[in-house]
Every structure is written in structure tokens, then in C-alpha cells.
Swiss-Prot record:
Lipoyl-binding domain location: 22-104
Cofactor requirements of the protein: (R)-lipoate
Gene3D superfamilies with a match to the protein in the record: 2.40.50.100
Protein task: The glycine cleavage system catalyzes the degradation of glycine. The H protein shuttles the methylamine group of glycine from the P protein to the T protein.
InterPro entries hit by this protein: 2-oxoA_DH_lipoyl-BS (IPR003016), Biotin_lipoyl (IPR000089), GCV_H (IPR002930), GCV_H/Fam206 (IPR033753), GCV_H_sub (IPR017453), Single_hybrid_motif (IPR011053)
N6-lipoyllysine carried by residues: 63
HAMAP family for this protein: GcvH (MF_00272)
Subunit: The glycine cleavage system is composed of four proteins: P, T, L and H.
Gene: gcvH
Protein name, UniProt field: Glycine cleavage system H protein
Cellular component GO terms held in the UniProt record: cytosol; glycine cleavage complex
Species this protein is from: Staphylococcus aureus (strain NCTC 8325 / PS 47)
GO biological process, alphabetically ordered: glycine decarboxylation via glycine cleavage system
Keywords tagged on the record: Lipoyl
């Protein structure tokens, strides 16, 4: 199971890629495999404020609905609108096509507190 080294991870199975002062957030390959076929993705609006630990959307699969938890706080600067019409991207390409939101980072220390790829791999038993 892919756990890219350049990303950071939350215990709730979100990944974070930092580009300057923006964090790109999605769900991990492990999370999508546990959920099964994704049929719907609900995301926040651009300019919404999200807070670390709070829900910022949900992913619906044929099995269940799973909340998305913000790994960091900040302002949503972009939403992946392709997921509205193509939720299957979450299964097919969790780290590329299926990024969910881009967030302006409000607290750098929250990035440092996330798991490394090695720690996340240990957590999921890889």
C-alpha cells in the first residue's frame, strides 16, 4: 500500500502535502481501501475556515459515510470540484487526482505535529 514519503499524515487517515503556505489535503490509500467504492464526496466551500480536528466534509462509499477531519486549521483556498462528478478518483488516485482541498496554513506547528510516512505506516501495520 502506497505511503508517499514526502507527505505528512493524520491519525484519521488524511494526508497533507505542503507547498509554501498552502496545505493540500486528501485521504490515504489505506482509508479509501477500507471504505470501498466511493460514490459521493462532500467538501467545504472556498473561503470557509476549517479547524484542526473538526469535520470539513464527508466521503460516502457503498459501505458507509465517513467524516473528513481537518488535520490542520486554515482558510480553504481551493476545492477539488472534479470529485463532485468523479468521486471514483478517490479510489483510483488518492494521492494525485483526488486531493480534496487546499488550505492556507494558519499554524505551522500543526504540520510538525502530523505523522511521518514511517510513523503512519507503523500505525496501519504496513
Amino acid at each position: 500500500m502506497a505511503v508517499p514519503n514526502e507527505l505528512k499524515y493524520s491519525k484519521e487517515h488524511e494526508w497533507v502535502k505542503v507547498e509554501g503556505n498552502v496545505a493540500i489535503i486528501g485521504i490515504t490509500e489505506y482509508a479509501q481501501s477500507e471504505l470501498g467504492d466511493i460514490v459521493f464526496v462532500e467538501l467545504p466551500e472556498t473561503d470557509d475556515e476549517i479547524n484542526e480536528g473538526d469535520t470539513f466534509g464527508s466521503v460516502e462509499s457503498v459501505k458507509t459515510v465517513s467524516e473528513l477531519y481537518a488535520p490542520i486549521s486554515g482558510k480553504v483556498v481551493e476545492v477539488n470540484e472534479e470529485l463532485e462528478d468523479s468521486p471514483e478518483f478517490v479510489n483510483e488516485s488518492p494521492y494525485e487526482k483526488a486531493w480534496m482541498v487546499k488550505v492556507e496554513i494558519s499554524d505551522e506547528s500543526q504540520i510538525e505535529a502530523l505523522l511521518t510516512a514511517e510513523k503512519y505506516s507503523e500505525m496501519i501495520g504496513e
